[in-house]
C-alpha cells in the first residue's frame, strides 16, 4: 500500500500533540497525533514544541493524556507505530507527498479503533465504561468509530471546498481547486492532483487528474478489499458520469457514460471508424486516452469508441475556492 523509492532514502519529520491512554490494560496506546507543521526534512523543527506543551495535560474522563512527541521517519520504510502512521497521513493531507508515493504497508495495524467524541478521542474498547464521566463534561456526541479521524479536524487544505467533513478521512490528498460535494467521499492515500469536482467515491490508492469530474454517486475500485493489485486512476479532463464506476485506469479526455460500471474483466466492443468491431477485456484499454465508454441501449453491450480529442471542461467559477 504505497510506493517506494529506489534512490536516496526520503525522510519526513514533525512535532505532534499525541493522545495516549493513561491506565488499564491499554495503557500507552496512542489514540491520535496532530502534526501542525510536518515537513520533508530528516530533523524536526522543534520551534513549535513549547507552544504545544501548553496543551499537554491529562484528561481523566477520557483516560488519556496529551503529550508532545517529535518524529523522524523514512518514507520508503513501513510505518513503525501510530505516531509514524499519523505523520504519513498528515503529509498526504498537507499535499507534501502524493498518494502511492510513500510506504503505508501495515498502517492499519498501527492504529487504534477510536470513538471520536466532541471531548476528544476515546479508545473504543473503553467508551462504555467512560461514558458517564464524559457526560459529566456536558453534551456528549460521537461522530464515528474508526481508526481514521476526519480530515478537517486535523488539516484544512488550501483552496478547496468540502460539503460534508464527515466524508473525508485524514490522509486524503486534495489539490487546490478541488470541490468535494456533500455526497463525495475521499479515502486516505487517495485524492485529486488538480482542479476537480468530486461528487462520488475516490477509493484508497485512486488519484484523479487535473480538470476531471467524478459524477454524483460514481465510484472507483480501490485495493483495500478483494485482493485487487491493479491501481485505478483517472487522467486529466475526464468524466465519470453519475452512478458510473471504473475498475481500470482512465487516460486523459475520457468519458464513462452515466450508470455504466466498467470492471477490468468487462467485455467491451471496440468501435473504430472503418473497422469491424472487436471484443476485448476492458483491462486492455486501461490508461488509454480519448475514449468514450457507453452501453448500447438495445443490446446492453458495453461499447468503446474514440472521442476525437474532445475534452471535458469544468465550470471555472465553481473551483475558485
From Swiss-Prot:
Keywords: Acyltransferase, Amino-acid biosynthesis, Cytoplasm, Diaminopimelate biosynthesis, Lysine biosynthesis, Magnesium, Metal-binding, Transferase. GO terms for molecular function: 2,3,4,5-tetrahydropyridine-2,6-dicarboxylate N-succinyltransferase activity; magnesium ion binding. Pathway: Amino-acid biosynthesis; L-lysine biosynthesis via DAP pathway; LL-2,6-diaminopimelate from (S)-tetrahydrodipicolinate (succinylase route): step 1/3. It is found in: Cytoplasm. Its EC number is 2.3.1.117. Mg(2+) 2 binds at residue 183. Mg(2+) 1 binds at residue 166. Succinyl-CoA binds at residues 201, 216, 219, 242, 257-258, 265, 281, 294-297. The active site is at residue 199. Coiled coil: none annotated. Pfam families: Hexapep_2, THDPS_M. One of its GO terms (biological process) is lysine biosynthetic process via diaminopimelate. GO terms for cellular component: cytoplasm. It comes from the Bacteria. It catalyses: (S)-2,3,4,5-tetrahydrodipicolinate + succinyl-CoA + H2O = (S)-2-succinylamino-6-oxoheptanedioate + CoA. Disulfide bonds: none annotated. It is an enzyme of class 2 (transferase). Homotrimer. Belongs to the type 2 tetrahydrodipicolinate N-succinyltransferase family. HAMAP family: DapD_type2. NCBIfam families: DapD_actino (TIGR03535). Catalyzes the conversion of the cyclic tetrahydrodipicolinate (THDP) into the acyclic N-succinyl-L-2-amino-6-oxopimelate using succinyl-CoA. This is 2,3,4,5-tetrahydropyridine-2,6-dicarboxylate N-succinyltransferase.
